[in-house]
Structure formats: structure tokens, C-alpha cells
Curated annotation (Swiss-Prot):
HAMAP family associated with the record: tRNA_metthiotr_MiaB
Cited Gene3D superfamilies: Methylthiotransferase, N-terminal domain, tm_1862 like domain
Residues reported to bind [4Fe-4S] cluster 1: C77, C113, C147
Purpose of the protein: Catalyzes the methylthiolation of N6-(dimethylallyl)adenosine (i(6)A), leading to the formation of 2-methylthio-N6-(dimethylallyl)adenosine (ms(2)i(6)A) at position 37 in tRNAs that read codons beginning with uridine.
Lineage per the UniProt record: Bacteria, Bacillati, Bacillota, Bacilli, Bacillales
Domain MTTase N-terminal: 68-186
Protein name, entry field: tRNA-2-methylthio-N(6)-dimethylallyladenosine synthase
Species for this entry: Staphylococcus haemolyticus (strain JCSC1435)
Assembly: Monomer.
Binding annotation for [4Fe-4S] cluster 2: C223, C227, C230
């Protein structure tokens, strides 16, 4: 789009906006938006799930983005990354072209994360930084989407303080993006579309996948666990499983397209299938069916220990393309804290599960998540988390200071753990994480492993980088032709969180190493 076209478009858009009447949001949250309510959320399982396989771009929207560009900034989990791929697919279907220059983008979307306060602060900082851009280019559309958009306090804050935002839409509204954009172009007021109905699963949404080697595949949406610290069941809604035939067809398509690795996604993948009324079919069954598809690696995340079944262990133990890496968040090693967290398992039942996994899958790599400084956590309770870590010997862990989320039950709890104590505990835990990570890495010295090469190293573009089946980062010198392929690499040096090696040969079949 040249400068004259841009100016003409700006005048037309602003004229249209001036003719519109400003919206009255006074009843918005009363009629459409439901703020977090544990009591109300627990009733939602009674709703039916509708499967919509007829998604298409309406004729009236075709060409909407012709001559226009878009940029999406993504915060948060793999689910958000996948949502970004879908939004990019819809935008390209509308005729928009992707750009990496935010100053040139005609549509800017901020895909947000609500899991921790720090993530929200980054988003508000980002939106604030865009005020200058909006002043200079009022025709550009700025949208805030993702999990933060499902929070009443966030929407109110944007409505009050960030008039540079043109549209707010939630996690259940992505398929409505063409309508949202159309209204934003014509509306003088901010477009707010945080759809509270969460019972639909929309298939056949277009996607622009990040790369051609690894792919995300959603198998379910939402979460019904209601851990007391977590906002996700409210922002992502109730558990809804995709039909297995739709998932399997998507995976087959990715295999045909040459993808080497897929990750099955869900807020709690272990609950997969429980809501499908006409079928007795769980994650173990899905994994077994996908193991028959010619794709080298299959991962899944995130797992809740409560739903991890012996059937799943049995399928993973068979080997094949289901990788021997299980991410199993424990959050705490103390029963009292686990109960307050609403995790539905005990230290003993978690360790029993770990022992069953290790017995059936001796070469398994276990990783976890841990929260430090939960409301009223004592030193003795924290010590139990450390001792559990010693007992399991996780190969890696994602560790966090507790972050209060408005609307969750934990937000009402009195927090008497001083900040300096929390940080000191986190430091002690991270020291242990580093110790066991280094111990796991040392096993690889002198061994040959199969690496899925993803591209150049972030630190040195003359070095290639990729991951083993157990998700270990490997940096190595090798031919550029290795990118996107499985290669054998001999490990020369082990570090605390990565491995260095030498390229040996191409390997189209996974090499199983213990």
C-alpha cells in the first residue's frame, strides 16, 4: 500500500467512525461477560458441545486485507502459539500479508497470557508503547486477544486507559476475526467481543504454521480441574475434546506434508475424551492410533497427574514415535499445600505414579513445574518439595514464584510469606534443578543421539541447533541441509542445560538411546 492509498484509506475509515454512535458498555459485563465464579463454572459441564466443520470465509470479507499487512505478538503457552497460527491463517485468507515491522503493520494483534502478573504487566507496557504509533497512524488497527481478554478487570482497564486499542476479543472468538475486523474498521468505539459461550469446537480453521518441521495439534480445549491458583479454567473454559477422527486426519496431513514432530496440546491432555458421550476413548487410545502414523516424533502437553492412566503408560512404553519424555507438573511436595492448591493428589500418590512410569519406561525423562511461596507455605513444607525433587530426580523443572490472579480462590487467601523468603527458596530450588539437569546431561557424553535440527543456534548462526527425543538442546556444527531433518550427532561436551556435539550422518529413522 503506497502513501496516497494509505491516506485515502485513513480518511475513509475515520469518516465512517465519525458517523458511528459510540457504544454504551454499561451493561456489557452484566449481559455478556461472566467474571470468574467457581460456583457457576462447576455447572458448565451440563452444556452440550457443538462441532462446527463448516468454517469458511464469507464472500463479503474476501479481499478485506488486500494491500494491508499484519503483525501478531504472542505471549504465553503453546496454546497461545497455536492460536496465533490460526489467526495468521485467517488474516492471510482475508488477503493480509505478514510483516515483521510493527511500524508498517496495518493490523497489530497482541495475543496475551493471564497465567502470571508479570506476563500481564508486559502486555500493558506493550499496549502503552503503541499509543505513539496509533497517534501517527490512526488507521492502523490494534487488537488485544487471548486469555487476558477474558478478565473483566483487564477489559475495564483497557476501556478506561488505552483508547489506542480498537478491539478486544477472547479465546472463544478467534473464528469471528473477520466480523471483528469489519466492525473495528467501521466503528468509532472499541469493539469488545469476549464471547461467553464456550461449548463449540470449530474445525477447518486455516493455519499458518511456524516452520515446516514441528507442529502443534490441539486435541482439546479448556480445563475443569480448578486449581485454586489458576485462572485458566475461567479464561479457556470447560474441557472440550475434539473428535479423534478430526485429530487423526490432521496428523496424517502433517505427515504427508513432511513434518517430523507434532505436539498434542491441551490445558489437561490427560482428560481427553471424557466429555465425548458416544465414545469410550481416552488419550492412551489416541496415542496408540497416532503411533501408527508415519511421523517420527509425537509429544503431548500438559499432563495432570490425577488423570495419568496405566493405559497411557502402556502405550508410551511400547516406544515407536511416542517420545519417552513426560512433563508431569507436581507444583509442591507437601500434602497440605497440594490440598490448598486443589491438585486432587497427594505426595504419595504422585510418587507412586512416578514409580509406575519408571518401572514401565526405564529410559523416561521426567520434567515438572513447581510453584514456590504459595500462601502460608512454611519452611518445613518447602523442604518437602526439595526432598521430593531429590526422590524423583527430575531432569528439568520450570519454577515460579506464586503470582496472585484476581478471581481465583487463592486470591482470597492471606499470604504471609515475605517476598525475600520466596526468592531465597526459589534460588535454593533452582540450584537443585541445575544439579539434576547437569547429572542428566552428563550421561550423554561420548554417546550418539538423534537430533531434530531446527535451524541455527540463537547465539551463533554458524552453529546448528535442535532437540533430542527427550527434549535436550544440542548445538553442533554441520551442513545447512540438516535443517528440518533428523541427524545423528556425537556428543563431545555436556553442559548444565545443553549439549555440544559433532554431526555424524543423516538419519531418517529415530535412534533410541537410553
Amino acid at each position: 500500500m503506497n502513501e496516497e492509498q494509505r491516506k485515502a484509506g485513513t480518511i475513509n475509515i475515520l469518516d465512517e467512525r465519525d458517523r458511528k454512535v459510540e457504544k454504551d458498555y454499561s451493561k456489557y459485563f452484566e449481559n455478556i461477560y461472566q467474571p470468574p465464579s467457581l460456583k457457576e463454572a462447576r455447572k458448565r459441564g451440563k452444556q452440550d458441545i457443538n462441532y462446527n466443520r463448516d468454517f469458511h470465509i464469507e464472500d463479503k470479507f474476501e479481499g478485506m486485507g488486500k494491500g494491508r499487512t499484519f503483525l501478531i505478538k504472542t505471549y504465553g503457552c503453546q496454546m497461545n502459539a497455536h492460536d496465533t497460527e490460526v489467526m495468521a491463517g485467517i488474516l492471510q485468507a482475508l488477503g493480509y500479508t505478514a510483516t515483521e515491522d510493527i511500524n508498517e503493520a496495518d493490523v497489530i494483534l497482541i495475543n496475551t497470557c493471564a497465567i502470571r502478573e508479570n506476563a500481564e504487566n508486559k502486555v500493558f507496557s506493550e499496549i502503552g508503547n503503541l499509543k505513539h504509533l496509533k497517534k501517527n497512524r490512526p488507521e492502523a488497527l490494534i487488537g488485544v486477544c487471548g486469555c487476558m481478554s477474558q478478565e473483566e478487570s483487564v477489559v475495564n482497564k483497557i476501556l478506561k486507559s488505552y483508547q489506542n486499542v480498537d478491539m478486544i476479543f477472547g479465546t472463544h472468538n478467534i473464528h469471528k476475526l473477520p466480523e471483528i475486523l469489519e466492525e473495528a474498521y467501521l466503528s468509532k468505539a472499541m469493539v469488545v467481543e469476549v464471547w461467553s459461550k464456550e461449548g463449540d469446537i470449530i474445525e477447518n480453521l486455516p493455519k499458518v504454521r511456524e516452520g515446516s518441521t514441528k507442529a502443534w495439534v490441539n486435541i482439546m480445549y479448556g480445563c475443569d480441574k480448578f486449581c485454586t491458583y489458576c485462572i485458566v479454567p475461567f479464561t479457556r473454559g470447560k474441557e472440550r475434546s475434539r473428535r479423534p477422527e478430526d485429530i487423526i486426519e490432521e496428523v496424517r496431513g502433517l505427515a504427508r506434508d513432511g513434518y517430523k514432530e507434532i505436539t498434542l496440546l491441551g490445558q489437561n491432555v490427560n482428560s481427553y475424551g471424557k466429555d465425548i458421550k458416544d465414545l469410550e476413548y481416552g488419550l492412551g487410545d489416541l496415542l496408540e492410533d497416532i503411533s501408527k502414523i508415519d511421523i517420527p516424533r509425537v509429544r503431548f502437553t500438559t499432563s495432570h497427574p490425577w488423570d495419568f492412566t496405566d493405559r497411557m503408560i502402556e502405550v508410551i512404553a511400547k516406544g515407536g514415535n511416542i517420545v519417552p519424555h513426560i512433563h508431569l507438573p507436581v507444583q509442591s511436595g507437601n500434602n497440605a499445600v497440594l490440598k490448598i492448591m486443589g491438585r486432587k493428589y497427594t505426595r504419595e500418590s504422585y510418587l507412586d505414579l512416578v514409580n509406575r512410569i519408571k518401572k514401565s519406561i526405564p529410559n523416561v525423562a521426567l520434567t515438572t513445574d513447581i510453584i514456590v511461596g504459595y500462601p502460608n507455605e512454611t519452611e518445613e513444607q518447602f523442604e518437602e518439595t526439595l526432598s521430593l525433587y531429590d526422590e524423583v530426580q527430575f531432569e528439568h523443572a520450570y519454577t515460579y514464584l506464586y503470582s496472585q490472579r484476581d478471581g481465583t480462590p487463592a486470591a482470597k487467601m492471606k499470604d504471609n510469606v515475605p517476598e525475600d523468603v520466596k526468592k531465597a527458596r526459589l534460588q535454593r530450588l533452582n540450584k537443585k534443578v541445575g544439579h539434576y539437569s547437569e547429572k542428566a546431561m552428563n550421561q550423554y557424553e561420548g554417546k550418539t543421539v538423534t537430533v531434530l535440527c531446527e535451524g541455527s543456534s540463537k547465539k551463533d548462526d554458524t552453529v546448528l541447533a535442535g532437540y533430542t527425543e527427550k527434549n535436550k538442546l544440542v548445538n553442533f556444527k554441520g551442513p545447512r541441509e540438516a535443517i528440518g531433518k533428523l541427524v545423528n550427532v556425537e556428543i563431545d561436551e555436556t553442559k548444565q542445560y545443553s549439549l555440544n556435539g559433532t554431526f555424524k550422518e543423516f538419519n531418517d529413522a529415530p535412534l533410541v538411546t537410553n
